[in-house]
Amino acid sequence: MKAILRASRIGRVILRYRLDALLEGTPAERWLRLAKPFVPRASAEIAAQSRGARLRLALQELGPIFVKFGQILSTRRDLIPADVAEELTLLQDRVKPFDGQAARLIVEAALGLPVSVAFASFDTVPLASASIAQVHAATLPPDANGVRREVVVKVLRPDIERQIDADIALLHSLATLVERTHPRADKIRPREVVAEIEGTLAAELDLQREGANASVLRRFWEGSDDLYVPEVIWSHTAERALTLERVYGIPSDDIAKLDAAGIDRKALAAKGVRVFYTQVFRDNFFHADAHAGNIWVDSDPERRLNPRFIALDFGIMGQLSQEDQYYLAENFMAIFHKDYRRMAELHVEAGWMPSNVRIDELEAAARSVCEPYFTRPLSEISLAQVLIKLFRVAQRYELTLQPQLILLQKTLLNIEGVGRQLDPKLDIWAVARPVLERILRERYSPRRVLRELGKRLPEIMTHAPDMPRLVHSWLKQQVEGRHQIDIRSPELLALDLSLRKLQTRVVTAITGSGLLVVAAVLYGLHPDGWYLGTVPVWSWISGGAGSAALLVAWLRR
């Protein structure tokens, strides 16, 4: 019954904000048409608004869970029009706070201690309140030196899980209906969108997981002059309560306060771009909710000329597969070099597009997207917009993107927005390019390869004895299979040639890998004999020969 009443209310809001066109061609449109005479017409002020603004206002009226839904939907620029996405980014996740005494009870239940024991003080008036949780100021009991450390405690709303489950169940029902009846369901993919929203909300409901995210990010940026991450107080953290070191700063979009504090905004803007690319390509762990409210600037007067950011809210973090990391970095470099052919090839090699796509057509599409940008001043070029438009054009060719890549698009857009707000003349390309080049050099350097081999040495040594037998068995099967096939057609001849080349490449690659294993073993054993630096000469020779063999195998692609 509650679900029916909730669905009825959603229908009334859709009609009042003139959003029924979104359901055109579905059974829901017919039901809404019947209900239309009984719903008050939209005011002239609402009717004059754009469709994106009307959707934003409707979501705000439907409540905090739908606000969160709109915020997540704003990241899916591959699914919704750009004007609607822009409007949805304006959604503010601010709601009326819940009772401070209720917050105390939740903290006590989570920590298994009375608040008066766990904390020296706990302010029942929240510092901030959102749809999932609210934040309270507190101090820890005195330490050995008698110091009471300032902290903040993030507390989940009471009964929030039940509310979310009910709304998500309703969204699943609506998504199923849209998928069955909407003429563009294959493009919108409603069930996929709702599943993504459900996953994001589930992550935000586990504050212990958020604490782990903060802890990992802090470890990556320990001692950095570019980014500070508050310390997690694990003794006072549980699934429904997260305690962090209290930090003080200025929101990154408060330009007046930044200028009053004498902050070097130009240096700060460049640092923001560098931090983002380092998180993505060095650490593979990036803050994926990096809007101005979650990015502060350290207000310490001593940091005026060497400012640093402070990260807040670690509920949504992003990671890419190693393959996506590589292809994305290569894609950016291809954009920098205006190598449209390589961009097209990378989209296919990454598995983002079907292998039967014509590369020349994709190359022409990439050229049509990028060339107009290259005629603009560098300060007006947005790498995020180029990437989004590339992916949007590629949708015509059955582009398939992982949710993490879509999350990265949205984060890049936010970071560029923050950077340009701090420094309107920021040249994103000039800042990003050297960072990408350095990270790619480091990522694929011989030293790093040897280090990774060293880490995987136990695994390699475990499987190494089986390799000759497996290779011999595979080659024997190839030879026997080739003798059994009577090749007549040009296609089969071409296939045979490809198999021969593949066989040669596999043997060369296995030989190279074996030599690198030998090099790593020699390095680990510290044998007697000649050394070059701290590495045995024979390790250098074996490693060099192995690298050469792998290079030959790679060049024969």
Swiss-Prot record:
What's the protein name?
A: Probable protein kinase UbiB
Q: Which residues form the Protein kinase domain?
A: 121-509
In which pathway does this enzyme or protein participate? Cofactor biosynthesis; ubiquinone biosynthesis [regulation]
Leading EC class = transferase
GO BP annotations of the record are: regulation of ubiquinone biosynthetic process; ubiquinone biosynthetic process
Q: What does this protein do?
A: Is probably a protein kinase regulator of UbiI activity which is involved in aerobic coenzyme Q (ubiquinone) biosynthesis.
- Its gene name is ubiB
Q: Which GO terms describe its molecular function?
A: ATP binding; protein kinase activity
In the Enzyme Commission scheme, what number(s) does this protein have? 2.7.-.-
